[in-house]
A protein has these predicted regions:
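Membrane-helix interface segments in multi-pass membrane proteins
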Residues: 1-2, 10, 84-142, 190-216
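Interfacial aromatic "cap" segments that immediately flank transmembrane helices
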Residues: 3-34, 60-86, 143-194, 221, ...
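Selective recognition of hydrophobic, aromatic-rich stretches within alpha-helical transmembrane segments
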Residues: 31-52, 121-161, 195-230
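Selected alpha-helical membrane-embedding segments in polytopic membrane proteins
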Residues: 39-98, 105, 113-127
Length: 230
């Protein structure tokens, strides 16, 4: 069944809500695990379970398997972001520089005490181009990485996360325009919720942190639905 973007947002949210509300231990474990480096691989592993395609939120079991799957998913995500990240980092080599001369005045005589090369506030044309290209590629590669992660989850094969032919075929079936629009809509909805919660005095930021497990389930099911409807 093909879902509209609105239907996907709604049904995936219901999936997340039904999977956590009333299952407070599951919510707590995902929250705590997500806050601890390395242990948070378990959270990524739980996302892999959702990516495999389930009608209800899966049980939190098989922690070692989730840890390993989470590590594999994270590696896939990192590999895809390396290229745009390298371009953005390379742009710093093309930052304009200026020399700051340090002087002191002694009895009417100006004495130079040293000079320091400082980066200017704006990059050169080449640097700016690399930043823009890197940012654009980061967006594109993040879209590809999501489908790659889901493909890995569904096949159980790490190498399938780099099966570019199959990955791009899936994205073409989804439709690049639809995929990008759906991603933008989802991000906007999540940002609105996060901003509204953060504005609550005293407890706003804490509430945003608490709903992170809900957001993980929500986005996992949202993008799995896109994949499955292709």
């Amino acid at each position: 069944m093909v879902l509209s973007i609105g239907e996907n947002v709604t049904t995936s949210f219901e999936f997340a809500k039904d999977g956590l509300v009333g299952y407070w231990t599951r919510w707590l474990i995902l929250f705590v695990a997500g806050c601890i480096p390395i242990v948070n691989f378990i959270t990524f592993g739980y996302l892999v379970k959702i990516y495999r395609g389930v009608d209800v939120a899966p049980e939190l079991e098989g922690y070692l398997e989730m840890f390993i799957d989470g590590l594999k998913l994270l590696i896939i995500e990192i590999v895809y972001i390396i290229v745009p990240l390298m371009l953005i980092v390379a742009s710093t080599a093309f930052m304009e520089t200026e020399t700051v001369v340090e002087t002191i005045d002694v009895s009417g005589m100006t004495i130079t005490t040293g000079a320091t090369i400082m980066p200017a506030s704006e990059p050169t044309g080449v640097g700016l181009a690399l930043i823009l290209i890197g940012a654009l590629l980061a967006v594109i590669f993040s879209l590809v990485a999501t489908i790659a992660g889901i493909r890995f989850a569904k096949t159980g094969e790490f190498g399938e996360g780099f099966n570019f032919g199959a990955i791009f075929e899936t994205i073409n079936e989804i439709g690049w325009g639809h995929y990008i629009l759906a991603s933008i809509v989802f991000i906007i909805v999540v940002c609105i919720i996060a901003v509204v919660l953060s504005l609550i005095p005293y407890i706003g930021e804490l509430l945003v942190m608490i709903i992170v497990p809900l957001l993980i389930l929500w986005q996992g099911k949202f993008f799995e639905n896109l994949y499955s409807c292709a």
